[in-house]
Amino acid sequence: MTTVVLIGTQWGDEGKGKITDFLAEKADLVVRYQGGNNAGHTVVVGENSFKLHLIPSGILYPEKICVIGNGVVIDPKVLKEELEYLRQRGVTTANLKISLRAHLIMPYHKKLDELEEEDKGENKIGTTKRGIGPAYRDKAARTGIRVCDLLDKELFAEKLALNLKEKNNLLEKIYGVEGFSYDELYHEYLEYAEIIRPYATDTSRLINDAIESGQKVLFEGAQGTLLDLDHGTYPYVTSSHPVAGAACIGAGIGPTKIHEVIGVVKAYTTRVGSGPFPTELLDETGEFLRKQGYEFGTTTGRPRRCGWFDGVIARYAARVNGLSGLAVTKLDVLTGLKTIKIAVGYRFNGKVINEFPASLKELSQCEPVYEELPGWSEDITGARKLTDLPENARNYLRKIEEITGVPIKIISVGTRRDQTIILDQVF
């Protein structure tokens, strides 16, 4: 297969960074197609740990071309910081490419994100306050500023003036806070323009040419299926589309160019922020998973809510993404549990349902229907083939395949690249 889309099947934080890094070794291009710096991924190379939020994980391979596609919203300040961070760590960024059509996050987006969240009171949705939502809102309203606009001084000046007139009016008259200085923002962003300029290009053409020439392209999704604007637990979602179908729009390729879709699924379930979570564990088992899995957000540092594996969610993600394979992560975290539960359905109004409900009111009233499986105590972090795993661990994986109807192709048993079991080659 020459093109692979890698997506998260849960609420994000599934371990996509590690799997992307692992698959990037065989890819020629690694492409981010949606989201912004609200998505954090951690990659461990040997004894070194790299935390990235915007630049694709493939940047750690110096010969790979890494693309920030048109579907991504870019905070130039964060981009500058990540470029400097990587250079200080000895990582070259020469092969980074940025879409001319990508939209920019402006300081007023971040301020509005913060104020709007505070204004919701008890109805907060758990935004990261990075300005992602307001930036996508401007994109949909056709008032956003793109990379190509920033690189044209006159056009940028015109668009910034129009935006500031509206945004300062909103900040000052509705929220009662000070607006932004045109001169300060203009000169700050002109500096960013010169940082971005060497990387800016028509990435759609670049990616399509690569596919046509037989090169291997990995599309890296951010967040997860249940944070998708259409298919997630709305309104507790992100402002973009983490599902596989968005790779076409966010990278500028046609759907016939996609050959494989791999869903990254954690061996249990986690969530950051507000919203229903049927299998959430508020007991010592939940705390065990949080500590063993070090479940704290890369972007926010917030402790993640933890729960048992939810087969209803996994089955739903398999359908809306058209998954051809699964990559199961953090299997090692379950080591030491005597009994492991998997939700195979929900009980709602006295009936068992097998489909993920659209209504959050319904979802909040759903109780998980569990199947119990025996756990294992053996250390599996050194396993490199399926037969190295204890029988109970293999049975657990078979159950996931049975529930989802999707074959497992990759199993992660630790944070390092080498702590990976390959059942079927993706590239």
Swiss-Prot record:
Pathway: Purine metabolism; AMP biosynthesis via de novo pathway; AMP from IMP: step 1/2
Positions annotated to bind GTP: 12-18, 40-42, 304, 330-332, 412-414
Active site: 13 (proton acceptor), 41 (proton donor)
Top-level taxon: Bacteria
Positions of substrate binding: 298-304
PROSITE patterns: ADENYLOSUCCIN_SYN_1, ADENYLOSUCCIN_SYN_2
Main location: cytoplasm
Family statement: Belongs to the adenylosuccinate synthetase family.
Assembly and binders: Homodimer.
Cited function: Plays an important role in the de novo pathway of purine nucleotide biosynthesis. Catalyzes the first committed step in the biosynthesis of AMP from IMP.
HAMAP family per record: Adenylosucc_synth (MF_00011)
Name assigned to this protein: Adenylosuccinate synthetase
Species lineage: Bacteria, Bacillati, Bacillota, Clostridia, Thermoanaerobacterales
